[in-house]
């Protein structure tokens, strides 16, 4: 159906728990670079980082996120950031929706039998839907080739 989003593939990059942090970050970097080369996305949408109660986990997530953003920048892929309430608003229509509502609406919008698994992949699909459904994303994507546009300063190395 023209104009309707469809899920091509989703998943999560995982690393062995016993691996030292630098090796885990390198694996995430390598896996991300491979995915970006394979799928050649037009843009990357990420959720704003916030620390809940476990700061130690948050620091690890921030380090992994930094590696992922670096690989997107290296591949000249524009990066767009959304708050959790923006994702909820775009997917459900209510910025304070519960996680289960977001997951169910994600499933319904994409015509899926089940919610994507694992939870991190389901969250990523909802963030991608938020970007696709954001009216400004179409304009932002067109403007993203200009240095300094958008939430992040995006270099255009494709010239």
In which residue ranges do the predicted regions lie?
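Phosphate- and other anionic-substrate recognition elements at nucleic-acid/protein interfaces
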Residues: 1-159
